[in-house]
Amino acid sequence: MDIDPYKEFGATVELLSFLPADFFPSVRDLLDTASALYREALESSDHCSPHHTALRQTVLCWGELMSLASWVGTNLEDPAARELVVSYVNDNMGLKVRQLLWFHISCLTFGRETVLEYLVSFWVWIRTPPAYRPPNAPILSTLPETTVVRRRRPSGRRTPSPRRRRSQSPRRRRSQSPASSC
Protein backbone atom coordinates (compact mmCIF):
# COMPACT_ATOMS: atom_id res chain seq x y z
CA MET A 1 0.00 0.00 0.00
CA ASP A 2 1.20 3.47 -0.84
CA ILE A 3 -0.16 5.65 1.96
CA ASP A 4 0.73 9.33 2.09
CA PRO A 5 0.29 10.55 5.69
CA TYR A 6 0.06 14.18 4.53
CA LYS A 7 -2.60 13.76 1.84
CA GLU A 8 -5.63 14.70 3.95
CA PHE A 9 -3.77 17.84 5.08
CA GLY A 10 -3.15 19.16 1.56
CA ALA A 11 0.53 18.20 1.45
CA THR A 12 2.51 15.22 0.17
CA VAL A 13 5.52 13.19 1.20
CA GLU A 14 7.32 14.71 -1.81
CA LEU A 15 6.62 18.24 -0.60
CA LEU A 16 8.35 17.51 2.70
CA SER A 17 11.06 15.24 1.33
CA PHE A 18 12.97 18.06 -0.39
CA LEU A 19 13.76 19.60 2.99
CA PRO A 20 17.21 18.45 4.13
CA ALA A 21 17.34 16.00 7.04
CA ASP A 22 19.13 18.52 9.25
CA PHE A 23 16.23 20.96 8.76
CA PHE A 24 14.13 19.01 11.26
CA PRO A 25 14.86 19.21 14.99
CA SER A 26 15.59 16.02 16.89
CA VAL A 27 12.71 13.76 17.86
CA ARG A 28 13.39 14.58 21.51
CA ASP A 29 13.13 18.34 20.86
CA LEU A 30 9.95 17.88 18.83
CA LEU A 31 8.39 15.67 21.51
CA ASP A 32 9.30 18.26 24.16
CA THR A 33 7.73 21.00 22.02
CA ALA A 34 4.56 18.98 21.44
CA SER A 35 4.32 18.26 25.14
CA ALA A 36 4.91 21.87 26.15
CA LEU A 37 2.41 23.31 23.69
CA TYR A 38 -0.27 20.65 23.30
CA ARG A 39 0.02 18.18 26.20
CA GLU A 40 -3.51 18.77 27.48
CA ALA A 41 -5.09 18.31 24.04
CA LEU A 42 -2.94 15.26 23.25
CA GLU A 43 -3.81 13.54 26.53
CA SER A 44 -7.50 14.47 26.35
CA SER A 45 -10.07 11.91 25.29
CA ASP A 46 -11.79 14.64 23.26
CA HIS A 47 -11.15 15.01 19.56
CA CYS A 48 -9.49 18.38 19.01
CA SER A 49 -8.44 18.36 15.36
CA PRO A 50 -7.02 15.99 12.74
CA HIS A 51 -3.56 17.46 13.47
CA HIS A 52 -3.88 16.58 17.15
CA THR A 53 -4.92 13.04 16.21
CA ALA A 54 -2.03 12.65 13.76
CA LEU A 55 0.41 14.06 16.31
CA ARG A 56 -0.92 11.69 18.98
CA GLN A 57 -0.53 8.70 16.64
CA THR A 58 3.00 9.73 15.65
CA VAL A 59 4.04 10.02 19.29
CA LEU A 60 2.57 6.58 20.02
CA CYS A 61 4.32 5.05 16.98
CA TRP A 62 7.64 6.53 18.07
CA GLY A 63 7.17 5.05 21.52
CA GLU A 64 6.50 1.61 20.04
CA LEU A 65 9.48 1.93 17.72
CA MET A 66 11.72 2.79 20.67
CA SER A 67 10.41 -0.25 22.56
CA LEU A 68 11.27 -2.43 19.57
CA ALA A 69 14.70 -0.82 19.27
CA SER A 70 15.36 -1.48 22.97
CA TRP A 71 14.31 -5.09 22.58
CA VAL A 72 16.56 -5.51 19.53
CA GLY A 73 19.43 -3.83 21.37
CA THR A 74 19.02 -6.21 24.28
CA ASN A 75 18.47 -9.40 22.30
CA LEU A 76 20.69 -8.98 19.25
CA GLU A 77 24.11 -10.22 20.24
CA ASP A 78 26.02 -9.31 17.09
CA PRO A 79 27.29 -5.70 17.60
CA ALA A 80 27.53 -5.08 13.84
CA ALA A 81 23.94 -6.21 13.29
CA ARG A 82 22.77 -4.17 16.29
CA GLU A 83 24.50 -1.07 14.90
CA LEU A 84 22.92 -1.69 11.50
CA VAL A 85 19.44 -1.85 13.02
CA VAL A 86 19.98 1.26 15.15
CA SER A 87 21.39 3.15 12.18
CA TYR A 88 18.45 2.16 9.97
CA VAL A 89 15.91 3.20 12.59
CA ASN A 90 17.61 6.56 13.18
CA ASP A 91 18.24 7.36 9.52
CA ASN A 92 14.95 6.22 8.01
CA MET A 93 12.25 5.88 10.61
CA GLY A 94 13.62 8.72 12.73
CA LEU A 95 13.53 11.10 9.77
CA LYS A 96 9.94 10.16 8.91
CA VAL A 97 8.87 10.68 12.50
CA ARG A 98 10.71 14.02 12.68
CA GLN A 99 8.96 15.13 9.48
CA LEU A 100 5.54 14.11 10.79
CA LEU A 101 6.06 15.72 14.18
CA TRP A 102 7.39 18.94 12.63
CA PHE A 103 4.53 19.16 10.12
CA HIS A 104 1.72 18.68 12.62
CA ILE A 105 3.26 20.86 15.34
CA SER A 106 3.84 23.59 12.75
CA CYS A 107 0.27 23.32 11.45
CA LEU A 108 -1.11 23.60 14.97
CA THR A 109 1.21 26.51 15.76
CA PHE A 110 1.07 28.55 12.53
CA GLY A 111 -1.96 27.14 10.69
CA ARG A 112 -2.08 24.63 7.85
CA GLU A 113 -2.29 27.21 5.06
CA THR A 114 0.75 29.06 6.40
CA VAL A 115 2.79 25.85 6.60
CA LEU A 116 1.81 24.83 3.06
CA GLU A 117 2.67 28.32 1.80
CA TYR A 118 6.01 28.07 3.58
CA LEU A 119 6.77 24.65 2.08
CA VAL A 120 6.01 25.89 -1.42
CA SER A 121 8.07 29.07 -0.85
CA PHE A 122 11.00 27.04 0.46
CA TRP A 123 10.65 24.56 -2.41
CA VAL A 124 10.82 27.42 -4.93
CA TRP A 125 13.73 29.05 -3.07
CA ILE A 126 15.81 25.87 -2.83
CA ARG A 127 15.28 25.02 -6.51
CA THR A 128 16.16 28.50 -7.74
CA PRO A 129 19.82 28.73 -8.78
CA PRO A 130 21.84 30.53 -6.08
CA ALA A 131 22.69 33.42 -8.40
CA TYR A 132 18.98 34.24 -8.82
CA ARG A 133 17.56 33.72 -5.35
CA PRO A 134 17.62 35.85 -2.20
CA PRO A 135 20.47 34.95 0.14
CA ASN A 136 18.20 33.88 3.00
CA ALA A 137 15.64 31.09 2.87
CA PRO A 138 12.04 31.79 3.84
CA ILE A 139 11.42 31.52 7.58
CA LEU A 140 8.17 29.99 8.75
CA SER A 141 7.62 32.34 11.68
CA THR A 142 8.02 35.47 9.54
CA LEU A 143 6.33 34.28 6.35
CA PRO A 144 2.67 35.10 7.00
CA GLU A 145 2.55 38.80 7.71
CA THR A 146 -1.24 38.62 8.13
CA THR A 147 -1.02 35.97 10.83
CA VAL A 148 1.35 38.13 12.85
CA VAL A 149 -0.94 41.13 12.43
CA ARG A 150 -4.01 39.12 13.47
CA ARG A 151 -2.28 37.95 16.62
CA ARG A 152 -1.20 41.46 17.58
CA ARG A 153 -4.44 43.34 16.90
CA PRO A 154 -6.29 42.72 20.15
CA SER A 155 -3.45 43.83 22.42
CA GLY A 156 -1.52 45.98 19.96
CA ARG A 157 -4.19 48.58 19.17
CA ARG A 158 -3.76 51.52 21.47
CA THR A 159 -5.05 54.26 19.20
CA PRO A 160 -8.50 54.07 17.65
CA SER A 161 -8.74 53.50 13.94
CA PRO A 162 -9.73 56.44 11.70
CA ARG A 163 -13.19 54.89 11.26
CA ARG A 164 -13.69 54.83 15.03
CA ARG A 165 -12.50 58.41 15.39
CA ARG A 166 -15.00 59.62 12.78
CA SER A 167 -17.90 57.84 14.44
CA GLN A 168 -17.03 59.22 17.87
CA SER A 169 -16.45 62.81 16.76
CA PRO A 170 -20.09 63.73 16.07
CA ARG A 171 -21.14 62.36 19.47
CA ARG A 172 -18.56 64.50 21.21
CA ARG A 173 -19.70 67.57 19.33
CA ARG A 174 -23.33 66.96 20.28
CA SER A 175 -22.48 66.63 23.96
CA GLN A 176 -20.41 69.83 23.85
CA SER A 177 -22.99 71.86 21.93
CA PRO A 178 -24.70 74.85 23.61
CA ALA A 179 -28.07 73.06 23.48
CA SER A 180 -26.83 70.26 25.71
CA SER A 181 -25.49 72.67 28.34
CA CYS A 182 -28.94 74.26 28.93
Swiss-Prot record:
Transmembrane segments: none annotated. Sequence repeats lie at residues 161-168, 169-176. One of its GO terms (biological process) is microtubule-dependent intracellular transport of viral material towards nucleus. The keyword Phosphoprotein applies. It holds the Pfam family Hepatitis_core. A motif (Bipartite nuclear localization signal) lies at residues 157-174. Residues 176-182 are annotated as: RNA binding. This is Capsid protein. The gene is C.
